[in-house]
Amino acid sequence: MTETGFHLKRRLTSFQIMILGFAGVILLGALVLMLPIAAASRTWTPFHEALFTSTSAVCVTGLVVQDTGSYWSGFGQTVILLLIQVGGLGVITAAVTFLMLSGRNISLKERSAMQDAISAPAVGGIVRLTRFILKGTFLVELVGTLALLPAFCRDYGLRGVWMAIFHSVSA
């Protein structure tokens, strides 16, 4: 016991870390989507609409309150695309990716959380598995983009490039 009578320090389980990670990404996404720069009309988006959109993107459900192509600006669409990507890869996989990109070593606790997140049989090889997941994901998205590119560019010009990328990632 401490002076206050309670000891509040507690270790979070891997499951709790994943839940908090998802909730944090959803909340951050909602706050960014509320900004005027995220809406094509350059007006503030109500919190409940931004939260619904962010939650739907991270949970990759595809439900929307506003039409993505007309309501959101290019910035807002990019935020939604990143939320879809993080949700699709998983918050823990995305976190390990950022750690790898920063050049920082991944701790045993982080490897253990990743093992739980992807149901890996062992902690060993988590970084290699993460690289495999990322390469596979981006390869499939690249093939999808290249397949959609001719039709979208024919119908929408240069805007079709962005549309092909967005549809490939969100599919």
PLM region spans:
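Membrane-proximal intracellular helices of multi-pass ion channels
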Residues: M1-A171
